[in-house]
Amino acid sequence: MTDGAASSAPDTSRRALAFVTMVRGDHEMLARWISHHGALAGTREALHIVAHGSDPRISGLAQGCSQIVLPYDPEGRDFEPRRVAMFFGLVAGLLGYYRHVVVLDTDEFLVAAPDCAPARDLAGYLDNADLQGVALSPLGFDLVHRPSVEPGALDWTRPITAQRRHGFMHVAYSKPCIFRRPPRKGGNQHRLRDQPMQIDPNLMLLHLRFADKDHGLRVSRQRSETVARFDAAGGGHRIGTWTDRERHLAQAIADIEASPCPDLRLADRRRFSIRQMELYARHVGRVLCRRGRSAGYRLPDEWVGCL
């Protein structure tokens, strides 16, 4: 068994699962995030919501969760490095009380594949996972709105995968986010310092950034305005994914409309995971996003209701 693999008996003095996210606005997405991950953890007490600035609506939505309110810096000084340092420090502390700490953005949802063992017992599955480093990566799936067959607006109160089924496997969202041990300083949410990439195709990270065209446009414009303010202030925010989002949304929708989108099967997930881990090892820990997106796929019928 490799270093860091699970012992035969989990430490029951610690709870099994905690989930962590950071949020500013986007209340519909947060409500869904809390509902979904609270069910996975078995209690809202295991959800740790970091609000970037005081927001009464977030406080109301997150009742029963652990809440931290951080001061909002309108200049965005060192935004991303400070955010990553906060996450890593919080993970290190929470691992004293939980066996697994999962860090996700508010538009990211951990889902156990319904055709595999973790769907029946996620905590037990993670306890017994043969982990090669400090964190496990679920397989990222970028859920994209396909208006030709999904014409309606997304209803956040209904099952998401009953309304949106199409998208791309993507290495950028195959993030090392399920922590069993504290990460070292110097990495980020997509790559951990001096750590292997270990993608588990039995676990999926469904990314909802582009799951609804209208919602995606609204959030994209808000984020672009925020980055423009940060740039004007010269705060060195180092945010690399918030600009030009409208163009990326339009391109993702065009690409998914042009794809035949066969059903996504376990063999496809395994093949993609192995390929991305090989590329990561070959390129000495670099995440190759330009070579990290699959063709379009459709989530099979058994995924309806998973989120």
Labelled PLM ranges:
Residues 26-27, 108-111:
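Short acidic, S/G/P-rich loop/turn micro-motifs used as interaction or catalytic elements
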Residues 48-51:
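Short internal beta-strands
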